[in-house]
Regions:
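S-adenosylmethionine
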Residues: 1-231
């Protein structure tokens, strides 16, 4: 059952017809998808290709991933296909990015847990720059940072560094990063199909709280972005 406050909000925001399409999607089962690790080829499950990600696969059914040794070997990462679009946009950026002279290309994934974006970014950076990049993968919440570190270790790229710092700490590195990716805290509508509790907890007050957090995080980390860098 869709949260009544959210239903009213979305109908006013995008119109009743468009909202009806969204509500229908929320009520349908979520497909299961994975993104293969290009550097551990040949051991990725088969599936329907994801249009916007060369390594994405939509599976015919959801297996028990924890029983698959390939999952534990980092051969693939379980990720919603929609979340892979961040990697698609990042790859398009790298197509036009020049290689820095005398230093690696530097990227910060600021709100990185559990690691989906980081592993996707790492694959693209490795393809474009070879060993000439560094990706800082940060998660401020200590418990989630542990999960992030585990997933990064499974992925196996040595140019990824995991940290657990408040965004304001990166202001000590003025103009350091060429790109900052920030999946800032949000009100979680993307979880509605997976978690009924996420629907029940939605409120305009929570949206306002998330907005304030987003503004604070962005302002705190902004000094660490180089001039003409991309946020």
């Amino acid at each position: 059952m869709i949260n009544g406050s959210f239903r009213k909000y979305l109908e006013e925001a995008i119109g009743s017809d468009n909202a009806l399409v969204a509500f229908s999607a929320f009520e349908s089962p979520a497909p299961s998808s994975i993104r293969c690790n290009p550097f551990k080829s040949g051991i990725c499950p088969e599936g329907r290709p994801v249009t916007w990600n060369a390594y994405g696969r939509i599976l015919p059914e959801r297996p028990v991933f924890t029983l698959d040794p390939h999952f534990h070997a980092g051969a693939y990462y379980v990720q919603d296909s929609s979340s892979m679009f961040v990697g698609h946009a990042f790859r398009r950026l790298l197509e036009s990015a020049g290689k820095p002279v005398g230093r690696p290309f530097r990227v910060l994934d600021l709100c990185a847990a559990p690691g989906g974006k980081t592993t996707d970014l790492a694959a693209s950076l490795r393809e474009v720059f070879g060993d000439g990049f560094i990706l800082v993968s940060n998660e401020v919440m200590k418990a989630r940072a542990g999960v992030l570190a585990d997933n990064v270790a499974l992925w196996g790229d040595p140019n990824v560094v995991v940290t657990s710092d408040d965004p304001r700490a990166f202001a000590a590195l003025p103009g350091f990063f060429d790109v900052i990716v920030a999946d800032v805290p949000c009100s979680g509508e993307g979880m509605f199909r997976k978690d009924e509790e996420a629907q029940r907890q939605w409120s305009e007050d929570n949206v306002a709280l998330c907005e304030a957090r987003q503004r604070r995080i962005t302002a705190d980390v902004w000094p660490s972005l180089r001039q003409d860098g991309l946020f």
